Amino acid sequence: MAVPGYYELYRRSTIGNSLVDALDTLISDGRIEASLAMRVLETFDKVVAETLKDNTQSKLTVKGNLDTYGFCDDVWTFIVKNCQVTVEDSHRDASQNGSGDSQSVISVDKLRIVACNSKKSE
């Protein structure tokens, strides 16, 4: 039975790094086998991808200077410098002001965007 592949991008996030560190500690202490740790990481990849796909309700707008871009193995990578990221949150239930939307702007010196083919995990 073929299992669909999921990107391992989120293993480099804060929570992903913490999970990898915890699993490494358990392996080095002899409490779990490396094969179990790999299954945990594969499950993590799947759950994060599906959760983001199903539960994301925010919209981002990025404005800045494109510094570098590249495409390899169906993955685009963009480096944007001096950019402003506008985050628009849309909530399912209306907030007290009636609109249900909120917006915030974040200024960053350098932003890396990694865009993957969504068909890989289907």
UniProtKB/Swiss-Prot annotation:
Gene3D superfamilies per the record?
Transcription factor IIA (TFIIA), beta-barrel domain (2.30.18.10), Transcription factor IIA gamma subunit, alpha-helical domain (1.10.287.190)
Q: Which InterPro entries match?
A: TFIIA_a-hlx, TFIIA_b-brl, TFIIA_gsu, TFIIA_gsu_C, TFIIA_gsu_N
**Which domain of life does the protein's organism represent?**
Eukaryota
Q: Where in the cell is it found?
A: Cytoplasm; Nucleus
Question: What's its job?
Answer: TFIIA is a component of the transcription machinery of RNA polymerase II and plays an important role in transcriptional activation. TFIIA in a complex with TBP mediates transcriptional activity.
Q: How does it assemble?
A: TFIIA is a heterodimer composed of the large TOA1 and a small TOA2 subunits. Interacts with TBP. Interacts with TAF11. Interacts with KAP122.
- Full protein name: Transcription initiation factor IIA subunit 2
- In its UniProt entry, the species of origin is given as Saccharomyces cerevisiae (strain ATCC 204508 / S288c) (Baker's yeast)
What gene does the UniProt entry assign to this protein?
Answer: TOA2
